[in-house]
Swiss-Prot record:
Recorded family membership: Belongs to the bacterial ribosomal protein bS6 family.
UniProt KW keywords: Ribonucleoprotein, Ribosomal protein, RNA-binding, rRNA-binding
GO-annotated biological processes: translation
Protein name: Small ribosomal subunit protein bS6
Amino acid sequence: MKKKTGQLYEGAYVFSVTLSEDARRKALEKVTSGITNYGGEVLKIHDQGRKKLAYTIRGAREGYYYFIYFTVAPEAISELWREYHLNEDLLRFMTLKASAVKEVLEFATLPE
């Protein structure tokens, strides 16, 4: 039997700033356990901290940003998205196919 290999993805997740540190850790764990529950593997998590949002989302002006590199079967992505939509702690998410895991993320500073 041929072993399935997963596609590499980069996920961007923005969590509510109203969460305590412990609640934020649990919300992030909920996202990562969802990936592993569908047979995926979390490769790298980048915590980008608290940042200002480009626009208001559900009354929030700021959010906690995380970037997660993971592998999972492509057919599992739609199920993960369904779970993300039901997660009230998650303000926004985006999942993209990735070509490689970035060890360091660099962003240009935007003028205020």
